[in-house]
Amino acid sequence: MGQDSNGIEFHQKRHGLLKDQVQLVKRRDSIRYEIVSIQDRLSFEKGFFAVIRACQLLSQKNDGIILVGVAGPSGAGKTVFTEKILNFLPSVAVISMDNYNDSSRIVDGNFDDPRLTDYDTLLKNLEDLKEGKQVEVPIYDFKSSSRVGYRTLDVPPSRIVIIEGIYALSEKLRPLLDLRVSVTGGVHFDLVKRVLRDIQRAGQQPEEIIHQISETVYPMYKAFIEPDLQTAQIKIINKFNPFTGFQSPTYILKSRKEVSVDQIKAVLSDGHTETKEETYDIYLLPPGEDPESCQSYLRMRNKDGKYSLMFEEWVTDTPFVISPRITFEVSVRLLGGLMALGYTIATILKRNSHVFATDKVFVKIDWLEQLNRHYMQVQGKDRQLVQSTAEQLGLEGSFIPRTYIEQIQLEKLINEVMALPDDLKNKLSLDEDLVSSSSPKEALLRASADRVAMRNKNLKRGMSHSYSTQRDKNLSKLAGYSSSDRRYEERNHDSPANEGFMTLLSEQISSLNERMDEFTSRIEELNSKLSCNKNSPTQQSLSIQTEVCNGSAPTSYFISGLDNGCLTNSIMPHSSSSSQLAKDSPLMEEISTISRGQRQVMHQLDNLCNLMRESSAERSRLARTGSSNSGNRGRSSKSSFLSNVESNKLPLVLTVAICSIGIIVIKSYINKRQ
């Protein structure tokens, strides 16, 4: 420790010369040397020089493997820093701690949890390397959240092994490390500043915002990462601005023109690779912004099971789209944290890509599922090469100098790309109400399912009134869904969703016909059983029959008497015929079955009513597609309203007719029994 103190004093005296700040000190109770801690935080470039200098000194003094730990929060620049070292010293071996994830320990998809790391395997590999043995390093696939294989790692010629990861300076690894390096700042801090700016711009109070950001955006940083970083001997502050990526931009040419796979292969060299990708781009709207005009989205990407945050700062130089291509991995919980701070999911874009890649250029065939479109993309760092490749593919003259989100905004298609991926819903437990309904048809089905489920539940309990109340609530919910998606429907009348809608309508009608046939056969069977009774009905039942046949009796008049398939609180007189009917148990079962069947028919009629209303609205929208002035739109709207009214008539008439038949048959039987 005395030497350590002397080293620190020496460092303070020679503050101006970086190479003199990197000093060795012998470890206590060990023959190995380590680096004296540098108290000042170094810039990215100075830190790189210091680490290279430290590795050189350590390899001169220490025998065997030199273990270097590089740790820091997500987005701080660990991977970039490690790659920079690898480019300078190609003989260095790098071990990523991500490959030591144990999928059985994942909790809520949180890959930042320190308990996730399989330290037993990692420590065994490090000990074997120290002994000069060949090791099998696991390969972890984030898409399947599983270990898919192993790669062989020999002791590198330089004897330097870098361990890179969030917890590379953890207590379990520190005793083995010869050099401890921390990297902080970078996009990690840029995100915090960006979130702070968005929240303040929305008029929120700044008190405790920083604390809230730390707790919600990076919940693991303060608790587990930051304490370990304090033990680093070389501390690097990455002041990297993500938008300095324009110094090495990616040039993109985009087109709707279709090009075959064979054409692409013919243009690219024989050494190209071919892969397929599936990505979800989640565009996060800052507080107070309009989704159709926002130019400052945060974009979170789900690809191969990993989540990354992308800073958007697009520049167009027609026909090129120029992108900084700055991304960094984040925890799956980041989305929930940002939403807790006031961000909302504006758009979710699912993209399936067929990628053809060479060393210098990428050609992609993108399929945007929600928009039902193909796009061609040619990307690369060399502007001239990108342009010549696009021209060879025959894309010249068809370029679209806009990003996908800009194209969506231009065409007012924000609501059409709101399909929330299942894995996000499962891992984040996001409520559907946090985003717009993915489809008005799905909203209709959800409302119908809720309505049918509630009715079945209330049938068992005999709660006809509560069913009516709940139905009104569900209808209001349905109206809310329809209102929020009206613009979507008007734009999407030719979309594949309509095919599914018509198929569903046909299935509902078919099911209704089957139940009507069953109901008719039941009534005929019951009539045959009642034909032996010849007693005439009383005046009261005649008057009731007249009301029912004329349709003047309210629906609740006979529904209230059919709860649970029995005739409680019914319009029947309390006479001896009631007790006789109760004693006739087989016939009572028949009547109960018919009552339940009647209610099931009403279920189908309810669903059919709503589906026909949607179909009528579709027809009215198609009819007014060609209209170009507000007057025509007003008349179409009125026509649509009248169509909706007309579409309700048939289900209402059928409902009243079926209920009338049921009550007439039951009353006839009772009166005859009298």
Curated annotation (Swiss-Prot):
Instruction: State which tissues express it.
Output: Predominantly expressed in the shoot apices of inflorescences.
Q: List membrane-spanning regions.
A: 650-670
* CDD domains tied to this protein: UMPK_like
Q: Where does the source fall among the domains of life? A: Eukaryota
InterPro entries in the cross-refs:
CYTH-like_dom_sf, CYTH_domain, P-loop_NTPase, PRK/URK
**So what EC number does this one have?**
3.6.1.1
Cite the GO molecular-function annotations of the record: ATP binding; inorganic diphosphate phosphatase activity; kinase activity; pyrophosphatase activity
Cell compartments where the protein resides? Mitochondrion outer membrane
- The region called Disordered is annotated at 457-498, 619-640
Q: Where is the composition biased (Low complexity)?
A: 623-640
According to the record, the signal peptide region is none
- Its membrane topology, per UniProt? Single-pass membrane protein
Q: What does the protein in this record do?
A: Exhibits pyrophosphatase activity with stronger affinity for pyrophosphate (PPi), moderate affinity for ATP and ADP, and weak affinity for tripolyphosphate (PPPi). No activity observed toward uridine substrate. Negative regulator of the salicylic acid (SA)-mediated amplification of defense responses against both virulent and avirulent pathogens, including oomycetes (e.g. H.arabidopsidis) and bacteria (e.g. P.syringae). Represses systemic acquired resistance (SAR).
Q: What is this protein called?
A: Inorganic pyrophosphatase TTM2
Classification of source organism: Eukaryota, Viridiplantae, Streptophyta, Embryophyta, Tracheophyta
